[in-house]
UniProtKB/Swiss-Prot annotation:
This is Germacrene A synthase short form. The keyword Lyase applies. Binds 3 Mg(2+) ions per subunit. It comes from Cichorium intybus. It is an enzyme of class 4 (lyase). Optimum pH is 7.0.
């Protein structure tokens, strides 16, 4: 095997002739073995669970309080949702919202200010009710058709309208206008603001709540919205205890997958790959943070780490001949195929087959082996997709945009990650749920498209510099004869419309339960987190480092 320099690049061994390899020189891990040393104190974990009982009951009573004003009730539910506590009171919240939605009267909103209207709109839309966007009509000037100048003096209201606009659907031009208008206005005043309002506006402009990672958004909410939280003392108390409880559980999960990764010795056998265990765990945590999904997170993290090894082998080390052999071996999925692949990748291949076999064996006992098979088939699909990309690169071929997207939706890794996320979710992922996934519904297509194009828009220059296969940006330019800026603008419009389709799919009546839709929505959110401003996975020193520090390194809030 080739020697490795300190900077991570491979050099040809002087004693043997090494093939020319497309080395990427990925940055090393930011974290090293930091998370291996964590030791879970179960007494502390149980202490937080017990301490949550009293404030949880107090918050439950507030939610069901029949004497509370409806706007105050919706404001309370809004804070509960922003704090990541909805799942603790799901039945109570749904009952309250069902009742309030049935009582909805557009004329009532004539009396509400912009902030109240926005909060109510967000609560209903976030939790599945299609409150009409007509509630914002009164804030537009009837003669000019634009938003009234007077609302520019209400920064809190404009912030609420900006967040509301992220929940828009196709055919809601007032919210398209609201998004552009409020973004411009908020950017013009943000540097004049002070205190928590300044933090709230900066946070929202950087990434609106609806596009954010739920755990991080919850952590920042009780830091930046203490006034909203402090109306009811039990709410911030519960939120902080809840965060601390989850933090302990999740640090233990991160320790488990970090130890597994180290024991598998991938950094020794395939040292050219990106060492990104905490980043992958963070990515999966973004799909579901609730305690009941602990096993699911561990399983999905391991499978996604397999994907990193595969991706970097195809993209940053293997020759085209080696890629063809490895793809064939993955298609065969048989230990006897190990003899045909290069020696450096054999340990990975064996571990891959062994881990999937063990998963299938364990879930077969529960009658749920089909979810493992679906994940395995998605893994085989992506290997074939990576081969297609490699063949294009090898021949210098730039695919047409439709051709690129057909393969690119596979190589985005969305299908592998989303199906692997189902494996450990338990009884809710039965044959009907898998059949729904396999039908490739519109909501899934939209999230998948975001996964592909958000990545392309952010990474196309880096990929060009490395001489890798053309991205969606390059294919769009070639196919439609547009400039680079025009291509990026068009891809961003496609991303924007895909978000509208996801929003529509999460409204009642839903095709499947929100338990199944949430990972789809959240995977789109995590793509935004990782790729909005940079390639946060390849170069994790900014956003992902900040988020990992906030959730696993920084001190807990109590």
């Amino acid at each position: 095997m080739a020697a490795v320099e300190a900077n991570g690049t491979f050099q040809a061994n002087t004693k043997t002739t090494e093939p020319v390899r497309p080395l990427a020189n990925f940055p090393p891990s930011v974290w090293g073995d930091r998370f291996l040393s964590f030791s879970l104190d179960t007494t502390e974990l149980e202490g937080y669970a017990k301490a949550m009982e009293e404030p949880k009951e107090e918050v439950r009573k507030l939610i069901v309080d029949p004497t509370m004003d409806s706007n105050k009730k919706l404001s309370l539910i809004y804070s509960v949702h922003r704090l990541g506590l909805t799942y603790l009171f799901l039945q109570e919240i749904e009952a309250q919202l069902d009742k309030l939605f049935k009582e909805f009267n557009l004329q009532d909103y004539d009396e509400f200010d912009l902030y109240t209207t926005s909060i109510n709109f967000q609560v209903f839309r976030h939790l599945g009710h299609k409150l009409p966007c007509d509630v914002f009509n009164k804030f537009k000037d009837s003669s000019s058709g634009t938003f009234k100048e007077s609302i520019t003096n209400d920064v809190k209201g404009m912030l609420g309208l900006y967040e509301s606009a992220q929940l828009r659907l196709r055919g809601e031009p007032i919210l398209d206008e609201a998004s552009a208008f409020t973004e411009t206005q908020l950017k013009s005043v943000v540097n004049t603001l002070e205190g928590n309002l300044a933090k709230q506006v900066m946070q929202s402009l950087r990434r609106p709540f609806h596009q954010g990672m739920p755990m991080v958004e919850a952590r920042m909410y009780f830091s930046n919205y203490d006034e909203e939280c402090s109306t009811h003392e039990s709410l911030p108390k519960l939120a902080k205890l809840h965060f601390n409880y989850l933090q302990l559980q999740q640090k233990e999960e991160l320790r488990i997958v970090s130890k597994w990764w180290k024991d598998m010795r991938f950094q020794e056998t395939t040292p050219y790959i990106r060492d990104r265990v905490p980043e992958i765990y963070l990515w999966i945590l973004g799909l579901y943070f609730e305690p009941r999904y602990s096993l699911a997170r561990i399983i999905a993290t391991k499978i996604t780490l397999f994907l990193v090894v595969l991706d970097d082998t195809y993209d940053a080390y293997a020759t085209i001949e080696e890629i063809r052999l490895l793809t064939d071996a993955i298609n065969r999925w048989d230990i006897s195929a190990m003899e045909q692949i290069p020696e450096y990748i054999r340990p990975f291949y064996k571990i891959l087959l062994d881990e999937y076999a063990e998963l299938e064996k364990q879930l077969a006992k529960e009658g749920r082996a089909k979810s493992v098979i679906a994940s395995k088939e998605a893994f085989q699909d992506i290997a074939r997709g990576y081969l297609e990309e490699a063949e294009w690169t090898n021949s210098g071929y730039v695919a047409s945009f439709p051709e690129y997207m057909k393969n690119g939706l596979i190589t985005s890794a969305y299908n592998v990650i989303s199906k692997s996320a189902l494996v450990g979710m338990g009884e809710m992922v039965g044959e009907d749920a898998l059949a729904w996934y396999e039908s490739h519904p519109k909501t899934l297509q939209a999230s998948e498209l975001i996964s592909r194009l958000q990545d392309d828009v952010m990474t196309y220059q880096f990929e060009r510099e490395r001489g890798q296969s053309a991205t969606g940006v390059d294919s769009y330019i070639k196919t439609y004869g547009v400039t680079e800026k025009e291509a990026i603008d068009e891809l961003n419009k496609m991303i924007e419309n895909a978000w509208k389709d996801i929003n529509e799919g999460c409204l009642k009546p839903r095709e499947v339960s929100m338990d199944l839709l949430a990972p789809i929505l959240n995977l789109a959110r995590m793509i935004d987190v990782v790729y909005r401003y940079d390639d946060g996975f390849t170069f994790p020193g900014k956003t992902m480092k900040e988020y990992i520090t906030l959730l696993f390194v920084g001190s807990s809030p109590m």
